[in-house]
Swiss-Prot record:
This is Small ribosomal subunit protein uS4. GO terms for molecular function: rRNA binding; structural constituent of ribosome. Keywords: Ribonucleoprotein, Ribosomal protein, RNA-binding, rRNA-binding. It holds the Pfam family Ribosomal_S4. SMART domains: Ribosomal_S4, S4. It comes from Prosthecochloris aestuarii (strain DSM 271 / SK 413).
Length: 203
């Protein structure tokens, strides 16, 4: 599937949120939209623009393009419960997201590369599909020939225990993890309002 190839830093500044670790320092230094008039853009934003911005945040944060994102929304609507909560839970169950949450990569983009390049196993079988949805109890680990890669070891060493969520159990020494349970919405700390996205799609 095609992926975004533009400047993630510019998109982060436009949306007002760091979409990747490398964008954090730039956003701290220039917390306004890019361009000549970025600092002066203070006009009132419309309801539609707010909804669209929240959708863009979610898509870029999880690395999902429009068609797939809309499919997640349709699945969320079909499930029992709150549609917005269901949408977030589906995105959190993505294989590349779980690899990122486990600390195997400092970014979701990096985690997606680990998956697509065939470095990862799920329950002992190679899975190279980033959108593969994890189920409670699923175990992830590296293929034998991919273990102890420098980038992974460095990421695990830098990842504080507080960053690894309670719904993922990580064995840093053996570079393994278990997806314990689907997180509740309040456990997912991300800078977006999914309810505005639901309102946008339900029009």
């Amino acid at each position: 599937m095609a992926r975004f190839r533009g400047s993630i830093t510019k998109v982060s500044r436009r949306l007002g949120v760091a979409l990747a670790p490398k964008a954090e320092k730039y956003l701290e230094r220039r917390p306004y939209a890019p361009g000549e008039h970025g600092q002066s853009r203070r006009s009132k934003i419309s309801e539609y623009a707010l909804q669209l911005r929240e959708k863009q945040k979610m898509k870029f944060l999880y690395g999902v393009l429009e068609k797939q994102f809309r499919n997640y929304y349709k699945k969320a609507v079909a499930q029992r419960g709150v549609t917005g909560d269901n949408l977030v839970k589906l995105l959190e169950r993505r294989f590349d997201n779980v690899v990122f949450r486990a600390g195997f990569s400092p970014s979701r983009a990096g985690a997606r590369q680990l998956v697509t390049h065939g470095h990862m196993l799920v329950n002992g079988r190679k899975v190279n599909i980033p959108s593969f949805l994890m189920k409670p109890g699923d175990a992830i680990e590296f293929r034998e020939k991919s273990k102890n890669m420098d980038a992974v070891t460095e990421s695990l060493n830098k990842a504080p225990e507080s960053r690894i969520p309670s719904w993922i159990q990580v064995d840093k020494a053996h570079q393994k993890a278990v997806f314990l349970t689907v997180p509740e919405r309040e456990e997912v700390q991300e800078p977006f309002n999914e309810q505005l996205v639901v309102e946008l799609y339900s029009k």
